């Protein structure tokens, strides 16, 4: 059991070695005979409960004790009562319990914590009176070993060894006092020598106290304030040398000196940070209205006080964050010194320290504020929010607030919107998936051959087998021209040596019409004259030419949007064309193709003026033809009008074409190709270039034979393709690749949404 002592300063040596033994103070009846001693404890449990819980009975025996000239009997009575109270509750507690030291047991109520703080402040006030009275006599607290201070120091050592683990449980409320013994529970939270200021007793008021202060407590407070005013002058004079001695003794005795109420800030910070949920209103009820107290759990940094001041350190080299990082070294250097000085002197010194250390600590304050600002705001918000009863919103409460009609109306609107949103998300995901599949699988589109049906393949193969023999013709090079639509069938009479007769120029008109309506046409030879190959591939195999293949999207009324292969160095622009196939049988029309033009395709035979002549150089210079269309020229028949990109579709009878004048190409290898446009749906499909009327560029670079003889062609065979045409590249014309498929789907989705909005 710890040694107990009183707070009086009269008979110090007599009370120095007194040891308080038994549980009840009635054993010390001699003290009661001297006056002011505790009365005999009650004999029933209810009286015991009232004595230790009701504030009016708590200090009844020692209300006038603690004065400057208090007798040892008063000190003994106060010590005995404190001892009995602590022992009744089953633990050994020091006489002067640290004010506002949080207990490790988190189960206290707000009122009990507040009462504990009130009574601890009362004990601290009585203790301060004893110490201050000894200071006026010039006594050294460590050298004289006075009766009032020796048990106090032992009690403080006990507090240090236990690390502030004990907190009185027998108090209900607290009344703020002038001075408070504030001992830090956690040594890592505060540095030695922190200066703080307490508010006067007048400004302090208990917040939401369950009961009023007893008469004895009020009398004790009046005595405290009178004594403080009386000894204020002498205390200021004796404060400085005593403080120096205490600082020296702190290093030898391994105790930390705390100036006035310095440790209370650290304990309050840790207490609020750990127990903000248990005590959400502690900032109002459990803490005095101190001008330097930060609001709501500001731990680990210098916070701005309520009146604009700032907490300052007495030891400038030491920083609070450095102390927190070195808790072991600070544990051994702590010495508890009771607060000294009056209210006015404390405020003056605080202001002076504020001015001295403002420049030194400005950087630290700003840095620490930045580091802990978010955490502190969270602490404050937690404390303020959790003190309010949480709202439990249920559908019934909403119905009661807005009414049944509005509730069901809002519910239906929300459900409908969620349903629409679910459908939209499904459509968007489907669009993204389809776009990625289309963009990532061009080979599937080629192999599946979407442009040709099974029925069409059969008829095309028959047509090709009947026309395996073909006549080579001159075709423009890749640099200047590009393949376009040709007539879908090859006439039987196109042989190598002699031009056939007009009646052998091709198949029946029915077959031609069928091929024209199906939109299937053969691609032309884009090379100089070569001999025909009797082992030409059929239509199904001719999808892989040694050229670039472009998968062009074609919108068909029967098939919808399909990708059809198109061979050529450049994709068609503008209108959508029928499919193109390379490596087909070359087309060569005889010189007597007038009847063929009229009978087979129904093209009215135009006048044959200067453009129709014998094989040789043309009578007019070659006209440059745009690279997206190749003129097909017949030595004897006029070329049909070439449908260009500006005329995407011209409804015509089967095989009807507009006719233009002869269009020649200014190129190194003179050639001519007869070009026909046959539509699947009775339409003349257009090529992808602009009209040739806009591209007439006459050049007189010399006569070039546009109608060479067959023998000259056969005698001078040339490679059918240039060097850069030997490689085959499959290029798919798609809106976006697989990487941007989601963007395309998003645009489609937005267009769908806009259409729905317009419909609504």
UniProtKB/Swiss-Prot annotation:
Organism, scientific name: Oryza sativa subsp. japonica
First-listed, main subcellular location of the protein, grouped into a coarse class: nucleus
UniProt GO cellular component terms: nucleus
Induction annotation: Circadian-regulation under short day (SD) conditions. Expression increases after midnight, peaks just at dawn and gradually decreases during the daytime.
InterPro entries cross-referenced by the UniProt entry: ELF3-like
Domain of life: Eukaryota
Biased composition (Gly residues): 1-12, 60-70
UniProt short sequence motif Nuclear localization signal, positions renumbered to this chain: 349-355
Name this polypeptide is given: Protein HEADING DATE 3B
Gene Ontology biological-process entries: flower development; positive regulation of long-day photoperiodism, flowering; positive regulation of short-day photoperiodism, flowering
Feature: compositional bias, Polar residues: 94-107, 511-522, 531-543, 707-730
Composition bias type Low complexity, residue spans: 71-87
Subcellular location: Nucleus
UniProt key word Zinc: no
